[in-house]
């Protein structure tokens, strides 16, 4: 069954990417998901095929299931959110469960965390903070210069890689620029860079404009997408 799904979803010879945003606050509309837009722009610059974005709440079972689905249809899954110390931060645990892997503590991360938080914590054995040091055994750790929650790059199965980032935009961007961008260029980038131009019209309805340029809209090269404002 899995092999059939892989044949169905993964395009032969193409590297495909999905973005998964985790956090109930996104689904409730409490915050605007700017991370996905920013990452999508970076993927376009790198020439990668990016076909799908998903947002999901802080539920262990649903996160695990969506990660398993993504593993069948894309080569690179970029995840933001759910890396913090609180009980609803479930991303790494869900990833491990999705591939039946154990988590181990990276002790050096705990030492680094204590250095960052020397004047901010009193309990040096804080189990909530230690949670952020737990990763699959073979995961490559992405340093977080702006926060305490590291990310990771991990390949749990053949032709499928997961990257995790904190949900805080400034932390995610710093980690992307410092580590992830170079890794993606070296391992995933293709020559499919999309060049785009914006043409603005005023004083005409969207339907009238569509009729006037119908031959262009129906073409595949270039792809034309009207946006009413």
Please provide the spans of the model-predicted regions.
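Short glycine-rich anion-binding loops that position phosphate/pyrophosphate groups of nucleotides
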Residues: 24-25, 82-85, 167-170
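Proline/glycine-rich low-complexity loops and linkers
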Residues: 65, 89-188
């Amino acid at each position: 069954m899995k092999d059939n799904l892989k044949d169905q979803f993964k395009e032969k010879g193409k590297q495909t990417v999905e973005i998964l945003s985790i956090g109930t606050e996104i689904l409730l509309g409490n915050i605007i998901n700017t991370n996905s837009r920013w990452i999508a722009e970076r993927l376009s610059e790198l020439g990668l095929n990016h076909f799908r974005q998903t947002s999901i709440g802080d539920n262990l079972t649903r996160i695990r299931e969506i990660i398993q689905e993504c593993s069948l249809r894309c080569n690179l899954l970029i995840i933001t959110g759910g890396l913090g110390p609180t009980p609803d931060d479930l991303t790494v645990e869900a990833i491990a469960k999705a591939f039946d892997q154990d988590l181990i503590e990276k002790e050096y991360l705990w030492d680094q965390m204590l250095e960052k938080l020397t004047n901010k914590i009193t309990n040096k054995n804080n189990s909530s903070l230690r949670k952020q040091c737990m990763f699959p055994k073979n995961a490559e750790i992405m340093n977080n210069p702006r926060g305490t929650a590291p990310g990771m790059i991990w390949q749990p199965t053949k032709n499928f890689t997961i990257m995790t980032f904190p949900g805080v935009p400034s932390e995610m961007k710093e980690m992307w620029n410092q580590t992830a961008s170079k890794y993606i260029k070296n391992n995933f980038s293709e020559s499919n860079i999309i060049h785009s131009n914006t043409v603005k019209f005023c004083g005409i309805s969207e339907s009238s404009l569509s009729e006037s340029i119908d031959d262009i809209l129906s073409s595949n090269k270039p792809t034309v997408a009207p946006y009413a404002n």
